[in-house]
Every structure is written in structure tokens, then in C-alpha cells.
From Swiss-Prot:
Gene Ontology biological-process entries: acetylcholine biosynthetic process; amino acid transmembrane transport; choline transport
Origin species: Drosophila melanogaster (Fruit fly)
Family matches, as InterPro entries: Choline_transporter, Na/Glc_symporter_sf, Na/solute_symporter
Protein name, entry field: High-affinity choline transporter 1
Ranges where the record places region Disordered: 583-614
Length: 614
């Protein structure tokens, strides 16, 4: 029977999210459809909204439904994701937020494409895309499960309907809409779930959590210790190289603020996990055959994935479930747009523009991104319909990102000079091969290699092969890069063998971004006839390759626009002059000023100086 109150609550909360999303989308500068404006909200996200949207990086439909499901099926000990993703925000803030934001990148793939080339960056886009699709699929599956409980709709129908609504909503705007709906989303989750907990806990059918038969804590068997560590490391470090995270980092006004938001959001992740943990424990203490629930008991995998909406539906009064179910549904819906936008942004910029259409206009890129939003939404829908467990889907989404992307992102951010395209491709192949060799029970992939401790009964690998794949990928990246560099630079391999043109056979028109300038907020390099800059405040002009004035790289001080522009121009001129001096091999004389000395010490008369700018 259809729950009228539940349907009304969903409609009202959806309208709230939709109105906020449309209102936030109007904050975009009129007529400004640039990549930064749509993908990064003009790098103008403030502290209050930033805290909420950074927390919502992980806190969404999959987070709350998956946490409750894990508590019910395996216990608190095995509910690693809230703690793992919280730590990933901490480590991301310490090691990645500051350098990534200082260099003014637009997507997470920018530094990878910078170091390894456009086509290798396109290859690295694939695991990033898989991760975003898996995550969005988990969100849609959670929403479909919620709707099937509330209005008694078939699960498949509800997933398809939910994805259509999410895609439609995402097309309304870029990061402005995503960020401001995140504020509503977290308020809905926090207030809606906490309102339901006292009523569910006091329900007459709920037993005592201290009962020995109600094991909501769980335990780790000795044979699963390495598996437990493997999953923990996967969540912590596999939670860093995600565009949904760096989208928030790169949209912050300053690098310092990006770090601060990461730390505060980590605490927010733990705080927001408390309500679903309690709801999962309440569900564990409930004999469901004594309630109004009419499904199979003990609960099957299909039912356990819906455990949170089931608690709200069957253990709370109608007027309470009105808020709880509606709030959860709206929260799930608003979190779907973030992953879809992230994947579409990376495709439009790092694949379509930088590989196929380097001279594409900004409006063309925006339209490509909108089409990509629809395609990514369809892929996520297919995944949501084919994988039964939300928590399994949620955990699996970090696998490829962890073993492939994390080692490569670590190297290009902190050790760029010690890696090249040969090492990147080799590491990619090694990581993918080892990960696939372990199989995947959720996808029905049989293992090619049964590592030590393999459980024949559960078809599960107890050996930490994911972490092994990540470490071997890192070692391969470093060693192959070192070997190829040594072979080419020593002359043992002729330059013509440098097929990737990344060691000695580098053409003049290849674009590379170097180290940040002394100002710490600028990044541009003259390479051949073109200058490339990722959002850096260098030479004025609308085209990105000529540099675009970027208000995000201003300090937190409210400088007048004219003053900020003057500082940017002076810094850019100083950079260009320094690079030209280095290129011509001249340096100022230390003796009397008025002469320039060549590196051989020969005096040269200076040209008459004029006052015109570059």
C-alpha cells in the first residue's frame, strides 16, 4: 500500500532541493560560461558553504544507507568507511590540498596530463570515471531502495526514475548548485535522522542493545586481519584521488582555506555517521517478523540494503517518518549531482578539449559537459541495477582509484621530476593486472590467482592484494621512469626511440607546467611559442593558453579589483622577464648596473629602457 505521507514528504523535499539549486545557479556571473565558473563556481566558495560541501564529498545517500547496512550485517568493527574516508580528508588536506590549489588546476587530472601528456591523462581518466560511476550508482541504488520502501514501487523502476530526476537536476547548473544544495542536504540528514532515532529506539518491538544475541559491534576473525587492513588502507588512501574532493579543494578561495575545509569536513564525516550507526544497531535489535514488515525474515541481501528506510518506515510514527524519509530522499538526490558533475567535467576538459579539440570554445566545452552528464547518469543507472549490495558497491568504487591513481597523483604532486610517461604506463598496466587477478565476487569475476589464505567457501581473497597492487604500481612508476631517463640521457638509447617524447625527444610545442613561482599562487611556463597556465594569473586574455586573470588566486583580503589586477600584472611581467633572461643566458651585472654580463663574463651594453609593459 502506498504511503501517502511518504510521497508528500518526498515531493516537498525534492522541491526544496530543486528551488535551492535553481537559486544557487543564478549566482553564476551573468554571461560567464567559462570552465572555472561552471566547474569550480569561479573559485569563490566561502567558508560556511565550503565546510558543508566538503563534508558532503562523502556524506550522502550511499554513506548513510551503507553505514546502517554494514552495522546490521557485520557490526561496527567492519563499518570502516566513515572512519576511512574521514582520514582520507585529513591526509588529503595535509599532502595534496595546498599544492594542488596553489597551482590553480581545474580538475584532478590536470597535473597528471601535465606530467605524462594528454593521451596518458586520457587513459588515467578511465579509473577516475569508473570510480565516479560506481559512487553515483551507489547513491542511485540507495534512493531507489528508499522509494521502493516508501511508495511500494519496484526497485528497478524507482532507480530509473531516480536517475532521470538526478540527471535533470544536475543539468540546471554547475558547482554553485551542487555546493548550496549540499548545505540543505546535510541539514536534512542531521535533523531528519536524529528526529527519528528516539521514536525508533522506544518502539515496543526493539530489544535491548546490551542483549548478547544482539551483536551490533561485530568482530574480526584472525584469518581476516590482513583483509581488514587492506580495506582500511583502501578507504583512507583510495579516498584521496577523487574529482569530487578536488572539485571542492580547487573551488576554495585560497590554498590555506582548502586545507582547513578538509580538516573540518573530516570531523563532519564522523559526526554525520552517528545517526546511521544507531539506526543500524536498532535494526539489529529488532525482530522484524513481529512488526508490520511482510517481507522475508531473516532479511535477505536485498532487504538489508534498505535497512535504514525500513527502520524509518516501520519503527516510527507517520508524522516522524514524514521528515525522516523525505529528508533522506532529498539528501540522496542532492548528492548524486556531485559525482555526475565531476565525471562530466573531467571528460569535457581533460579528454574532449585537451586531446581532441584543443581549440574548442568555452561554450562548446560546457555543452559537451552537459551531454556527458546524461551519459554518466545512464552508466550509473546500469551499475545501480546490476549490483545488489550498496555497501559492496560503495567499497568497490575506491579499488581502481586506489591501485592506479593514488601512486601516480602522489608522484606528480610531490616528486614530479622522478616520473615520466613510460613509468606511468607501466605502473598502470601492473596495477590493473594485479587488481583483476584477484577477482571480484560482487561482479562475479573469478580470481585468476588465488593468493595465500584464499577462502574457497566465500570466494574471498584474505591476502591484501589491493595494497600490494598499489605498492607495486608505485615501485614500477619510479623504477621504469628512472631506467628510461638514465638510458636516454646516457645515450644508450637514441633520442629517436623516445616514442612518448617525454625524456630527450621533447618537441618545442609540448606544454608542461613547472614548479610554482615564488609568489606561491602563480603558475605559468613559456614552452615554445605558447604559454600554458591552469587558471594562473598571467598575461591577460580570454583564451586559457594565454592565461586568464583568476580572481581565485587573490588573497583572503578584500583587495580592490584594480589593485589586485595591478599586482597580478606586475607578477606576471616579472615572471616573463625572468624566463626570458634565463632563455638568453644573461644576468644582471653585480658591479655597476647599466651593463649586462653574459655567462662567459663579456660585458654588453644595455639597450635603452622604455616604460612600456610586455
Amino acid at each position: 500500500m502506498i504511503n501517502i505521507a511518504g510521497v508528500v514528504s518526498i515531493v516537498l523535499f525534492y522541491l526544496l532541493i530543486l528551488v535551492v539549486g535553481i537559486w544557487a545557479g543564478r549566482k553564476k556571473q551573468s554571461g560567464n560560461d567559462s570552465e572555472e565558473e561552471v566547474m569550480l563556481a569561479g573559485r569563490s566558495i566561502g567558508l560556511f558553504v565550503g565546510i558543508f560541501t566538503m563534508t558532503a564529498t562523502w556524506v550522502g545517500g550511499g554513506y548513510i544507507n551503507g553505514t546502517a547496512e554494514a552495522i546490521y550485517t557485520s557490526g561496527l568493527v567492519w563499518c570502516q568507511a566513515p572512519f576511512g574516508y574521514a582520514l582520507s580528508l585529513v591526509f588529503g588536506g595535509i599532502f595534496f590540498a595546498n599544492p594542488m590549489r596553489k597551482q590553480g588546476y581545474i580538475t584532478m587530472l590536470d597535473p597528471l596530463q601535465d606530467s605524462f601528456g594528454e593521451r596518458m591523462g586520457g587513459l588515467l581518466f578511465l579509473p577516475a570515471l569508473c570510480g565516479e560511476v560506481f559512487w553515483a550508482a551507489g547513491i542511485l541504488a540507495a534512493l531507489g531502495a528508499t522509494l521502493s520502501v516508501i511508495i511500494d514501487m519496484d526497485h528497478r523502476t524507482s532507480v530509473i526514475l531516480s536517475s532521470c530526476i538526478a540527471i535533470f537536476y544536475t543539468l540546471f547548473g554547475g558547482l554553485y548548485s551542487v555546493a548550496y544544495t549540499d548545505v540543505i542536504q546535510l541539514f536534512c540528514i542531521f535533523i531528519g535522522l536524529w528526529m527519528c532515532i528516539p521514536f525508533a529506539w522506544s518502539n515496543e518491538h526493539v530489544g535491548s542493545l546490551s542483549d548478547l544475541e544482539v551483536d551490533w559491534i561485530g568482530h574480526v576473525e584472525p584469518k581476516k586481519h590482513w583483509l581488514y587492513i587492506d580495506y582500511g588502507l583502501l578507504l583512507v588512501f583510495g579516498g584521496i584521488p577523487w574529482q569530487v574532493y578536488f572539485q571542492r579543494v580547487l573551488s576554495s578561495k585560497t590554498a590555506g582555506r582548502a586545507q582547513l575545509l578538509s580538516y573540518v569536513a573530516a570531523a563532519g564525516c564522523i559526526l554525520m555517521a552517528i545517526p546511521p550507526v544507531l539506526i543500524g544497531a536498532i535494526a539489529k535489535a529488532t525482530p522484524w517478523n513481529e512488526t508490520d514488515y511482510k517481507g522475508p525474515y531473516p532479511l535477505t541481501v536485498d532487504e538489508t540494503s534498505m535497512i535504514l528506510p525500513m527502520v524509518l518506515q516501520y519503527l516510527t510514527p507517520d508524522f516522524v517518518s514524514f521528515f525522516g524519509l523525505g529528508a533522506v530522499s532529498a539528501a540522496v538526490m542532492s548528492s548524486a549531482d556531485s559525482s555526475v558533475l565531476s565525471a562530466a567535467s573531467m571528460f569535457a576538459r581533460n579528454v574532449y578539449k585537451l586531446i581532441f579539440r584543443q581549440k574548442a570554445s568555452e561554450m562548446e566545452i560546457i555543452w559537451v559537459m552537459r551531454v556527458a552528464i546524461i551519459v554518466v547518469g545512464i552508466l550509473a543507472t546500469i551499475m545501480a541495477l546490476t549490483i545488489p549490495s550498496i555497501y559492496g558497491l560503495w567499497s568497490m568504487c575506491s579499488d581502481l582509484v586506489y591501485v592506479i591513481l593514488f601512486p601516480q597523483l602522489l608522484m606528480v604532486v610531490h616528486f614530479k621530476k622522478h616520473c615520466n610517461t613510460y613509468g606511468s604506463l607501466s605502473a598502470y598496466i601492473v596495477a590493473l593486472a594485479i587488481r583483476l587477478s584477484g577477482g571480484e565476487a560482487i561482479l562475479g569475476l573469478a580470481p585468476l590467482i588465488k593468493y595465500p589464505g584464499y577462502d574457497e567457501e566465500t570466494k574471498e581473497q584474505m591476502f591484501p592484494f589491493r595494497t600490494m597492487a598499489m605498492l607495486l604500481s608505485l615501485v614500477t612508476l619510479i623504477s621504469v621512469s628512472w631506467w628510461t631517463k638514465m638510458m636516454f640521457e646516457s645515450g644508450k638509447l637514441p633520442p629517436s626511440y623516445d616514442y612518448f617524447r617525454c625524456v630527450v625527444n621533447i618537441p618545442e610545442d609540448v606544454q608542461r607546467v613547472g614548479d610554482p613561482s615564488e609568489s606561491g599562487e602563480q603558475l605559468s611556463v613559456m614552452a615554445g611559442p605558447l604559454a600554458r597556465s591552469y587558471g594562473a594569473a598571467t598575461m591577460a586574455g580570454k583564451d586559457e593558453r594565454n592565461g586568464r586573470i583568476n580572481p581565485a588566486l587573490e588573497s583572503d583580503d578584500d583587495l580592490p579589483v584594480a589593485e589586485a589586477r595591478r599586482i597580478n600584472q606586475e607578477t606576471a611581467q616579472a615572471q616573463v622577464k625572468k624566463m626570458l633572461d634565463n632563455a638568453t643566458g644573461v644576468k644582471p651585472s653585480g658591479g655597476g648596473g647599466g651593463h649586462l654580463q653574459s655567462q662567459s663574463g663579456m660585458a654588453m651594453p644595455t639597450a635603452e629602457q622604455d616604460n612600456t609593459a610586455f
